Amino acid sequence: MTKPHDFKTKAIIVRKTKCGEADRILSLLTPDLGLIQGFAKSVRKTKSKLSGHLELLCYSEVSLARGKAIDTITGSQTIQSFLNIRNSLQLSAMAFYACELAYHFSPEEAANPAMFQLLLSTLEELDNGSQPELCLKYFEINLLASSGYKPELRECANCHKKLQATINYYSPESGGVICPNCRNTQIGMPVSVNTVKVLRYIQENSFSSICRLKINREILSELELAIRANIRFVLEKEPKALLWLDSLRLADL
Protein backbone atom coordinates (compact mmCIF):
# COMPACT_ATOMS: atom_id res chain seq x y z
CA MET A 1 0.00 0.00 0.00
CA THR A 2 1.47 3.39 -1.04
CA LYS A 3 1.59 5.95 1.73
CA PRO A 4 0.47 9.55 1.04
CA HIS A 5 2.62 12.43 2.27
CA ASP A 6 0.56 12.77 5.45
CA PHE A 7 -1.33 9.78 6.76
CA LYS A 8 -2.97 8.24 9.81
CA THR A 9 -2.94 4.63 10.91
CA LYS A 10 -3.90 2.56 13.90
CA ALA A 11 -0.82 1.00 15.44
CA ILE A 12 0.56 -0.97 18.35
CA ILE A 13 3.93 0.27 19.62
CA VAL A 14 6.08 -2.88 19.61
CA ARG A 15 9.55 -1.39 20.02
CA LYS A 16 11.21 1.88 20.97
CA THR A 17 14.81 2.97 20.52
CA LYS A 18 16.48 6.06 21.98
CA CYS A 19 17.77 8.53 19.43
CA GLY A 20 19.79 11.61 20.35
CA GLU A 21 19.11 13.39 23.65
CA ALA A 22 15.30 13.43 23.60
CA ASP A 23 14.05 11.60 20.50
CA ARG A 24 12.96 8.04 19.83
CA ILE A 25 12.51 5.77 16.84
CA LEU A 26 9.37 3.69 17.28
CA SER A 27 8.40 0.46 15.57
CA LEU A 28 4.67 0.44 14.84
CA LEU A 29 2.70 -2.65 13.90
CA THR A 30 -0.24 -1.58 11.75
CA PRO A 31 -3.11 -3.49 10.09
CA ASP A 32 -2.76 -1.88 6.66
CA LEU A 33 0.95 -1.08 6.33
CA GLY A 34 2.57 -3.86 8.32
CA LEU A 35 5.59 -2.91 10.43
CA ILE A 36 6.69 0.70 9.96
CA GLN A 37 9.23 2.96 11.68
CA GLY A 38 8.38 6.40 13.01
CA PHE A 39 10.62 9.19 14.30
CA ALA A 40 9.21 10.76 17.48
CA LYS A 41 10.93 14.10 18.02
CA SER A 42 11.47 15.29 21.62
CA VAL A 43 9.14 12.56 22.91
CA ARG A 44 11.43 11.83 25.87
CA LYS A 45 11.08 15.36 27.22
CA THR A 46 8.84 15.63 30.31
CA LYS A 47 6.61 18.23 28.65
CA SER A 48 6.06 16.24 25.46
CA LYS A 49 2.35 15.96 24.62
CA LEU A 50 2.95 12.75 22.67
CA SER A 51 4.92 10.71 25.20
CA GLY A 52 1.93 9.17 26.98
CA HIS A 53 0.41 8.06 23.67
CA LEU A 54 3.58 6.45 22.32
CA GLU A 55 4.61 4.07 25.08
CA LEU A 56 5.46 0.45 24.42
CA LEU A 57 2.25 -1.66 24.22
CA CYS A 58 0.05 1.37 23.46
CA TYR A 59 -2.64 0.84 20.84
CA SER A 60 -2.98 4.28 19.28
CA GLU A 61 -4.07 6.19 16.22
CA VAL A 62 -0.87 7.74 14.91
CA SER A 63 -0.41 10.61 12.45
CA LEU A 64 2.77 10.62 10.37
CA ALA A 65 4.46 12.76 7.74
CA ARG A 66 6.29 10.81 5.08
CA GLY A 67 10.05 11.31 5.01
CA LYS A 68 12.88 10.21 2.71
CA ALA A 69 14.59 7.93 5.22
CA ILE A 70 11.99 7.61 7.97
CA ASP A 71 8.46 8.91 8.59
CA THR A 72 7.96 11.50 11.35
CA ILE A 73 5.23 11.09 13.95
CA THR A 74 3.22 14.32 14.13
CA GLY A 75 0.38 13.24 16.42
CA SER A 76 -1.00 10.34 18.40
CA GLN A 77 -4.13 9.47 20.38
CA THR A 78 -4.34 6.41 22.63
CA ILE A 79 -7.10 3.94 21.81
CA GLN A 80 -6.19 1.39 24.47
CA SER A 81 -3.35 1.44 27.02
CA PHE A 82 -3.85 -1.97 28.71
CA LEU A 83 -3.59 -0.72 32.30
CA ASN A 84 -4.04 -4.16 33.87
CA ILE A 85 -1.00 -5.40 31.97
CA ARG A 86 1.06 -2.39 33.07
CA ASN A 87 0.11 -2.98 36.71
CA SER A 88 1.40 -6.58 36.68
CA LEU A 89 5.06 -7.54 36.23
CA GLN A 90 4.11 -11.01 35.00
CA LEU A 91 1.60 -9.74 32.43
CA SER A 92 3.99 -6.97 31.34
CA ALA A 93 6.74 -9.52 30.69
CA MET A 94 4.33 -11.65 28.64
CA ALA A 95 3.13 -8.64 26.66
CA PHE A 96 6.68 -7.40 25.97
CA TYR A 97 7.57 -10.91 24.79
CA ALA A 98 4.58 -10.95 22.43
CA CYS A 99 5.55 -7.52 21.06
CA GLU A 100 9.14 -8.63 20.55
CA LEU A 101 7.99 -11.67 18.59
CA ALA A 102 5.59 -9.58 16.50
CA TYR A 103 8.47 -7.22 15.69
CA HIS A 104 10.83 -10.02 14.60
CA PHE A 105 8.20 -11.94 12.61
CA SER A 106 6.84 -8.90 10.72
CA PRO A 107 8.66 -7.75 7.58
CA GLU A 108 8.72 -3.98 7.18
CA GLU A 109 5.95 -2.33 5.16
CA ALA A 110 4.28 -5.63 4.23
CA ALA A 111 0.64 -5.65 5.32
CA ASN A 112 -0.31 -8.59 7.53
CA PRO A 113 -3.74 -7.88 9.07
CA ALA A 114 -3.80 -11.34 10.67
CA MET A 115 -0.59 -10.62 12.59
CA PHE A 116 -1.89 -7.24 13.79
CA GLN A 117 -5.21 -8.72 14.93
CA LEU A 118 -3.45 -11.61 16.65
CA LEU A 119 -1.25 -9.26 18.69
CA LEU A 120 -4.15 -6.93 19.51
CA SER A 121 -6.37 -9.82 20.62
CA THR A 122 -3.55 -11.26 22.72
CA LEU A 123 -2.98 -7.96 24.52
CA GLU A 124 -6.72 -7.63 25.14
CA GLU A 125 -6.95 -11.15 26.56
CA LEU A 126 -3.88 -10.65 28.76
CA ASP A 127 -5.39 -7.40 29.99
CA ASN A 128 -8.61 -9.27 30.83
CA GLY A 129 -6.64 -11.84 32.83
CA SER A 130 -7.95 -14.74 30.73
CA GLN A 131 -5.64 -17.75 31.21
CA PRO A 132 -2.38 -15.82 30.55
CA GLU A 133 -0.18 -18.91 30.02
CA LEU A 134 -2.60 -20.41 27.51
CA CYS A 135 -3.05 -17.01 25.92
CA LEU A 136 0.69 -16.84 25.27
CA LYS A 137 0.74 -20.33 23.78
CA TYR A 138 -2.17 -19.38 21.52
CA PHE A 139 -0.24 -16.32 20.38
CA GLU A 140 2.99 -18.22 19.69
CA ILE A 141 1.35 -21.03 17.71
CA ASN A 142 -0.76 -18.68 15.61
CA LEU A 143 2.18 -16.30 15.15
CA LEU A 144 4.08 -19.13 13.48
CA ALA A 145 1.05 -19.90 11.29
CA SER A 146 0.43 -16.29 10.22
CA SER A 147 4.14 -15.91 9.36
CA GLY A 148 4.27 -18.94 7.09
CA TYR A 149 5.75 -21.36 9.64
CA LYS A 150 2.61 -23.30 10.56
CA PRO A 151 3.76 -26.57 12.17
CA GLU A 152 2.42 -29.84 10.77
CA LEU A 153 0.48 -31.63 13.53
CA ARG A 154 -1.74 -34.15 11.73
CA GLU A 155 0.79 -36.15 9.73
CA CYS A 156 4.50 -36.76 10.04
CA ALA A 157 6.29 -33.64 8.80
CA ASN A 158 8.97 -35.86 7.27
CA CYS A 159 7.32 -38.96 5.71
CA HIS A 160 3.77 -37.48 5.61
CA LYS A 161 2.12 -40.57 7.10
CA LYS A 162 -0.75 -40.04 9.54
CA LEU A 163 0.53 -39.68 13.11
CA GLN A 164 -0.40 -42.53 15.43
CA ALA A 165 -1.56 -42.22 19.05
CA THR A 166 1.87 -42.82 20.57
CA ILE A 167 4.90 -40.82 21.67
CA ASN A 168 5.92 -38.70 18.67
CA TYR A 169 8.58 -36.02 18.31
CA TYR A 170 8.47 -32.29 17.69
CA SER A 171 11.06 -31.21 15.14
CA PRO A 172 11.34 -27.51 14.18
CA GLU A 173 13.86 -28.46 11.50
CA SER A 174 11.30 -30.76 9.87
CA GLY A 175 8.43 -28.30 10.25
CA GLY A 176 6.32 -29.97 12.93
CA VAL A 177 5.71 -33.36 14.54
CA ILE A 178 7.54 -36.41 13.22
CA CYS A 179 6.80 -40.11 13.80
CA PRO A 180 9.05 -42.53 15.75
CA ASN A 181 10.40 -44.06 12.52
CA CYS A 182 11.58 -40.69 11.20
CA ARG A 183 13.08 -39.88 14.60
CA ASN A 184 15.99 -42.13 13.57
CA THR A 185 17.07 -39.64 10.89
CA GLN A 186 15.69 -36.34 12.20
CA ILE A 187 16.23 -34.30 15.38
CA GLY A 188 13.17 -34.02 17.61
CA MET A 189 11.98 -33.79 21.22
CA PRO A 190 9.40 -36.25 22.58
CA VAL A 191 5.80 -35.04 22.84
CA SER A 192 2.96 -37.03 24.40
CA VAL A 193 -0.32 -37.88 22.70
CA ASN A 194 -2.15 -35.33 24.86
CA THR A 195 0.37 -32.59 24.09
CA VAL A 196 -0.11 -33.09 20.34
CA LYS A 197 -3.89 -32.99 20.87
CA VAL A 198 -3.59 -29.68 22.74
CA LEU A 199 -1.32 -28.25 20.03
CA ARG A 200 -3.91 -29.15 17.40
CA TYR A 201 -6.75 -27.71 19.44
CA ILE A 202 -4.96 -24.40 19.97
CA GLN A 203 -4.01 -24.21 16.29
CA GLU A 204 -7.53 -24.92 15.04
CA ASN A 205 -9.79 -23.07 17.51
CA SER A 206 -10.49 -19.56 18.77
CA PHE A 207 -9.04 -18.22 22.00
CA SER A 208 -12.48 -18.19 23.62
CA SER A 209 -12.58 -21.96 23.05
CA ILE A 210 -9.12 -22.75 24.40
CA CYS A 211 -9.83 -20.72 27.55
CA ARG A 212 -11.98 -23.62 28.70
CA LEU A 213 -9.09 -26.09 28.50
CA LYS A 214 -7.70 -27.53 31.72
CA ILE A 215 -4.05 -28.34 31.11
CA ASN A 216 -1.71 -29.87 33.67
CA ARG A 217 1.82 -28.61 34.29
CA GLU A 218 3.45 -31.53 32.43
CA ILE A 219 1.61 -30.82 29.18
CA LEU A 220 2.17 -27.07 29.54
CA SER A 221 5.89 -27.72 29.98
CA GLU A 222 6.02 -29.89 26.83
CA LEU A 223 4.11 -27.24 24.90
CA GLU A 224 6.55 -24.57 26.00
CA LEU A 225 9.65 -26.58 25.12
CA ALA A 226 8.33 -27.43 21.65
CA ILE A 227 7.07 -23.96 20.75
CA ARG A 228 10.15 -22.20 22.10
CA ALA A 229 12.38 -24.51 20.08
CA ASN A 230 10.36 -23.69 16.96
CA ILE A 231 10.59 -19.93 17.54
CA ARG A 232 14.31 -20.15 18.32
CA PHE A 233 14.85 -22.16 15.13
CA VAL A 234 13.08 -19.56 12.97
CA LEU A 235 14.70 -16.51 14.61
CA GLU A 236 18.10 -18.21 15.08
CA LYS A 237 18.26 -16.65 18.55
CA GLU A 238 16.45 -16.50 21.89
CA PRO A 239 14.01 -13.58 22.32
CA LYS A 240 15.43 -11.17 24.91
CA ALA A 241 12.12 -10.72 26.75
CA LEU A 242 12.17 -14.41 27.69
CA LEU A 243 14.98 -13.78 30.17
CA TRP A 244 12.77 -11.42 32.17
CA LEU A 245 9.72 -13.65 31.85
CA ASP A 246 11.63 -16.73 33.02
CA SER A 247 13.19 -14.87 35.95
CA LEU A 248 9.73 -13.79 37.12
CA ARG A 249 8.43 -17.33 36.84
CA LEU A 250 11.34 -18.65 38.90
CA ALA A 251 10.80 -15.99 41.56
CA ASP A 252 7.15 -17.01 41.77
CA LEU A 253 7.97 -20.67 42.53
UniProtKB/Swiss-Prot annotation:
GO CC term (a single one): bacterial nucleoid
Top-level division of the source organism's lineage: Bacteria
GO BP term, example: DNA recombination
Keyword Transcription attached: no
InterPro entries, alphabetized: ARFGAP/RecO (IPR037278), DNA_rep/recomb_RecO_N (IPR022572), NA-bd_OB-fold (IPR012340), RecO (IPR003717), RecO_C (IPR042242)
UniProt KW keywords: DNA damage, DNA recombination, DNA repair
HAMAP family: RecO (MF_00201)
UniProt-listed NCBIfam families: reco (TIGR00613)
Family label: Belongs to the RecO family.
Function noted in UniProt: Involved in DNA repair and RecF pathway recombination.
Name this polypeptide is given: DNA repair protein RecO
Lineage summary: Bacteria, Bacillati, Chloroflexota, Dehalococcoidia, Dehalococcoidales
Gene: recO
